[in-house]
A protein has these predicted regions:
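Generic beta-strand/beta-sheet core signal
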Residues: 1, 14, 45-46, 67-69, ...
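Residues immediately flanking
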Residues: 3, 47, 119
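Short, glycine-anchored, charge-dense loop/turn motifs used at functional sites
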Residues: 4-8
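Active-site beta-loop-alpha junctions of metal-dependent nucleic acid enzymes
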Residues: 10-37, 48
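Short amphipathic alpha-helical segments and helix-helix/interface helices
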Residues: 30, 55-56
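Secondary-structure transition/capping motifs at alpha-helix termini
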Residues: 34-39, 61-65
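Acidic/histidine-rich, metal-coordinating catalytic segments
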Residues: 35-54, 70
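Domain-scale segment recognizer with a strong primary affinity
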Residues: 56-211
Length: 211
């Protein structure tokens, strides 16, 4: 997650449990972030072993300042934790609704959720994708509803044909949008309710124990 813009990229690493190797994390960051955005000035991570070793060595060699947060102090990367939590909430809903199973389906699902959160989240009136690229990203026909794509009949046919991979991806995206609205609204309602939290008015009695 880019702290300034809120731009978020989640990367599929592998199937199974356990901590991934630092080389896997390095390759993922190089392919999915550095390849198009360049090396960041600073990287702040938790204290997981996957964020050390080769990862730190190579990033430091590229002039990146790598910092680990304190022990048991996830609040130091609170924005990253909140974004990650919302992403997982959206993914869980899509996986449950669309019965996503297997490595190939997860690999198709991940970029669709990335696109949705970077398009629909707002920071200063603009989406993270707009802050980073300077424009609204161009998506598949039928997504933006503009005249430029209205004549793309083949793409629209692919969209409604359940046997195509394209239709599968569009179903993931549509479900992810619904899940994002639900998760984002729930978060905003919770913030509004807790913003000025105070005890409920009432006749409270205080008990004294003189024993």
């Amino acid at each position: 997650v880019d702290i300034g813009t809120g731009f978020q990229i989640e990367i599929y690493l592998r199937m199974g449990h356990g901590t991934p190797r630092s080389t896997q994390c390095l390759d993922a960051v190089m392919q999915q972030w550095v390849s198009w955005a360049g090396c960041p000035k600073n990287i702040v991570t938790d204290r997981g072993m996957n964020n050390r070793g080769v990862f730190v060595k190579e990033m430091s060699a590229a002039g990146v300042n790598c910092v680990n947060i304190g022990l048991e102090a996830p609040y130091q990367i609170g924005k990253v934790e909140r974004h990650g939590s919302m992403w997982k909430t959206i993914a869980a809903k899509v996986i449950d609704e669309k019965q996503v199973r297997g490595e190939q389906m997860i690999m198709r699902l991940t970029p669709e959720i990335n696109a949705v959160v970077n398009e629909m989240r707002r920071n200063g009136g603009f989406s993270p994708a707009q802050w980073v690229t300077g424009r609204t990203p161009r998506y598949a026909a039928g997504e933006q509803g503009d005249d430029e794509q209205a004549h793309m009949l083949q793409a629209l046919e692919e969209r409604i044909d359940p046997s195509t991979i394209f239709a599968e991806r569009m179903e993931y995206r549509h479900e992810a949008k619904k899940a994002f609205v639900y998760a984002d609204s729930s978060s905003k309602v919770a913030k509004a309710m807790l913003r000025k939290a105070a005890p409920i008015n009432g006749d409270y009695s205080t008990c004294h124990n003189n024993a």
